[in-house]
Amino acid sequence: MREALQSLLVALQFLTRLPVRLSAMPTPEQFGRAVLCYPLVGVLIGVVLYGAARSLDGTPPLLQAALLLSLWVALSGALHLDGLADMADAWVGGLGDRERTLAIMKDPRSGPAAVVALVLVLLLKFGALAALLGAGRPGLLLLAPWLARSSLPLLFLTTPYARPGGLGQAIAEHLPARSLPWVLGVSFGLALAFGLSGLLALLVTLMLFAWLRSRFLARLGGTTGDTAGALVELTECAVLVALAL
């Protein structure tokens, strides 16, 4: 139980900006075990968003959507948005070359592709949030962060890490590979409790995952922290839009 709680705290500290205090810097092994808790972190983010949505009942849907999206970004500290921006720049500027793509991902500067990607994703999220809230379906907000963070363990489990060194490789080397399939099965299975909406969200998540993973392998031969962050943002966006249509 103590080890499970430690893994959850490490996952919360890594994936969110919630005030989690650890007694010491987590070891690579602890970072690896924490991947088991990524889906739960997604659920917690969804619960916070749902609670915020209910507390804003009566607020005009557009304003409510803007406030919730701001909270959503604040909860993650824009961690995954940063990965999306880096990947967008690298994919455009890399011109199909692996080493050039990896080099651009490490460049802290943002180019036009990064800005456009961020604007489009945030705009789509805002529109989908407004539609869901306007339709009185705030409970579906749970699905996007939950399934997006469930896709991360699936990515680490099935895809080699493309860049040597760093935290990403440490996580990849210490994955609890025997436990992860069970966790993923439970996480994806529970999404079906939302009925047809859950099934739709799950299908969108898995189809997008398969396509993005194939792109990562074709360009990089694996994944990186930036592509993992992009996977989260694009999955959240796709699930929200699919549910809002």
UniProtKB/Swiss-Prot annotation:
Keyword Metal-binding: no
Keyword Cell inner membrane assigned: yes
Catalytic activity: alpha-ribazole + adenosylcob(III)inamide-GDP = adenosylcob(III)alamin + GMP + H(+); alpha-ribazole 5'-phosphate + adenosylcob(III)inamide-GDP = adenosylcob(III)alamin 5'-phosphate + GMP + H(+)
GO CC annotation, single: plasma membrane
Membrane topology field: Multi-pass membrane protein
InterPro entries: CobS
Localization annotation: Cell inner membrane
EC number: 2.7.8.26
GO molecular function, one term: adenosylcobinamide-GDP ribazoletransferase activity
Membrane-crossing segments per the record: 31-51, 61-81, 113-133, 138-158, 192-212
Pfam families: CobS
Main subcellular location: membrane
Cofactor: Mg(2+)
Involved pathway(s): Cofactor biosynthesis; adenosylcobalamin biosynthesis; adenosylcobalamin from cob(II)yrinate a,c-diamide: step 7/7
Keywords: Cell inner membrane, Cell membrane, Cobalamin biosynthesis, Magnesium, Membrane, Transferase, Transmembrane, Transmembrane helix
Gene Ontology annotations of biological process type: cobalamin biosynthetic process
HAMAP family assigned: CobS
Similarity comment: Belongs to the CobS family.
NCBIfam families associated with the record: cobS, PRK00235.1-5
Function: Joins adenosylcobinamide-GDP and alpha-ribazole to generate adenosylcobalamin (Ado-cobalamin). Also synthesizes adenosylcobalamin 5'-phosphate from adenosylcobinamide-GDP and alpha-ribazole 5'-phosphate.
Designated name of the protein: Adenosylcobinamide-GDP ribazoletransferase
